């Protein structure tokens, strides 16, 4: 039986962090919908404070629409768009930014309160401070991403989209891990088995797969090669190579989709092998075994959902579900990696 120090855990702090994690999850999902509806460039200004309010009059709506008309996306893709149609894409981007602001408020105010009341375990204070800083950085990265589509491109740069999503998911993982530590406390000893390394490696692989998925989304690569398991009848797409090494890795539709597929196959095999190993293991605690089985199930569901999404050319509902599934898989992998460290 693990012994915990009472001063080393705080259930109120844990619950607060779990709420933050749910809000980050919602922001990731709405961000996916924003990308799929091509709404991310609808707000062409960055106003962290005043931008929290949407246009409140017809004149304000027209002013925002006129700003949108100045960017390449309107001229080359949405020329002739009506004000009502513009409002449709505006609300997605506004909701995404509003959730970002809400995450900041829900994190910062309780953090100060718990800090003053000395309710945060000492070893977690620095983590919470880092999370607060990363949250602020995420807002800057978000605008950096949007700005890439305001002058020459008709969409945001895929590598900047990958950076924005990657930081959001890193925050998601960090918040969940910290919440679990706040809930359970720190064990006097940590379990040292081969499972620790494997679980962290699997978590890293899931995170990397999410970054590959961002490149697929940023290049609209889910709209091509919509057969499976082949790609237009071939194992390797004919249009694999891009303009140079980075062009292939980050901008070739064929390459980014193939890489995303291959990583999915690797994760699927690794999850099945881990599930069998967990079932046979005598050293793995029962709670960790259960988490491993859930992890296998989530991997299988996400793989099936990914194939379905691809073969139907990424309809909005399935695309959003696939992004939500990626976040759920990451949360499950995080929980498993955290759990196997504890005896």
UniProtKB/Swiss-Prot annotation:
What's the short name of a Pfam family annotated to this entry? COX15-CtaA
Q: What class of enzyme is it?
A: oxidoreductase
Q: In which pathway does it act?
A: Porphyrin-containing compound metabolism; heme A biosynthesis; heme A from heme O: step 1/1
Cofactor requirements of the protein: heme b
The protein's matches in InterPro entries, at most eight in alphabetical order, are given as:
COX15/CtaA_fam, HemeA_Synthase_type2
From the Swiss-Prot or TrEMBL record, state where the protein is found: Cell membrane
Keywords assigned by UniProt, alphabetized: Cell membrane, Heme biosynthesis, Iron, Membrane, Metal-binding, Oxidoreductase, Transmembrane, Transmembrane helix
Q: How does this protein lie in the membrane?
A: Multi-pass membrane protein
Extract the GO molecular function terms from the UniProt entry: metal ion binding; oxidoreductase activity, acting on NAD(P)H, heme protein as acceptor
Enumerate the residues binding heme: 260, 322
- Give the UniProt entry's GO cellular component terms: plasma membrane
| Taxonomic superkingdom | Bacteria
Question: Is Metal-binding there in the keyword field?
Answer: yes
Assembly and partners are described as: Interacts with CtaB.
Fetch the HAMAP family from UniProt. Answer: HemeA_synth_type2
Q: What is the recorded function of this protein according to its Swiss-Prot or TrEMBL entry?
A: Catalyzes the conversion of heme O to heme A by two successive hydroxylations of the methyl group at C8. The first hydroxylation forms heme I, the second hydroxylation results in an unstable dihydroxymethyl group, which spontaneously dehydrates, resulting in the formyl group of heme A.
The entry assigns this protein to a family as follows:
Belongs to the COX15/CtaA family. Type 2 subfamily.
**Stated name of the protein:** Heme A synthase
Source organism of this protein record: Caulobacter sp. (strain K31)
- What's the encoding gene here? ctaA
């Amino acid at each position: 039986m693990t012994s915990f120090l009472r001063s080393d855990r705080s259930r109120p702090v844990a619950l607060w962090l779990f709420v933050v994690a749910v809000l980050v999850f919602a922001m990731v999902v709405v961000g996916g919908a924003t990308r799929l509806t091509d709404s991310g460039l609808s707000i062409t200004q960055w106003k962290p404070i005043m931008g929290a309010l949407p246009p409140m009059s017809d004149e304000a709506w027209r002013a925002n629409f006129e700003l949108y008309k100045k960017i390449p996306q309107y001229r080359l893709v949405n020329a002739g768009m009506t004000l009502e149609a513009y409002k449709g894409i505006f609300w997605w981007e506004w909701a995404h930014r509003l959730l970002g602001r809400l995450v900041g408020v829900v994190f910062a105010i309780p953090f100060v309160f718990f800090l003053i009341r000395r309710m945060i375990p000492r070893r977690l204070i620095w983590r919470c401070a880092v999370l607060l800083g990363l949250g602020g950085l995420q807002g800057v990265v978000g605008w950096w991403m949007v700005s890439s589509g305001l002058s020459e491109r008709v969409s945001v740069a895929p590598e900047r989209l990958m950076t924005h999503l990657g930081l959001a998911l890193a925050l998601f993982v960090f918040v969940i891990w910290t919440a679990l530590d706040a809930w359970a406390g720190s064990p006097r000893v940590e379990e040292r088995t081969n499972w620790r390394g494997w679980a962290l490696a699997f978590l890293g692989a899931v995170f990397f797969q999410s970054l590959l998925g961002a490149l697929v989304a940023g290049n609209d690569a889910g709209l091509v090669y919509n057969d499976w398991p082949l790609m237009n009848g071939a194992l390797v797409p004919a249009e694999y190579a891009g303009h140079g090494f980075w062009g292939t890795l980050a901008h070739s539709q064929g390459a980014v989709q193939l890489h995303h597929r291959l990583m999915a196959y690797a994760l699927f095999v690794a999850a099945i092998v881990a599930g069998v190993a967990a079932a046979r293991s005598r050293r793995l605690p029962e709670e960790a075994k259960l988490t491993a089985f859930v992890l296998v199930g989530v991997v299988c569901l996400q793989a099936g959902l990914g194939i379905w999404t691809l073969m139907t050319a990424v309809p909005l509902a399935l695309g959003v579900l696939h992004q939500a599934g990626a976040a759920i898989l990451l949360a499950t992998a995080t929980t498993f990696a955290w759990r196997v460290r504890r005896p």
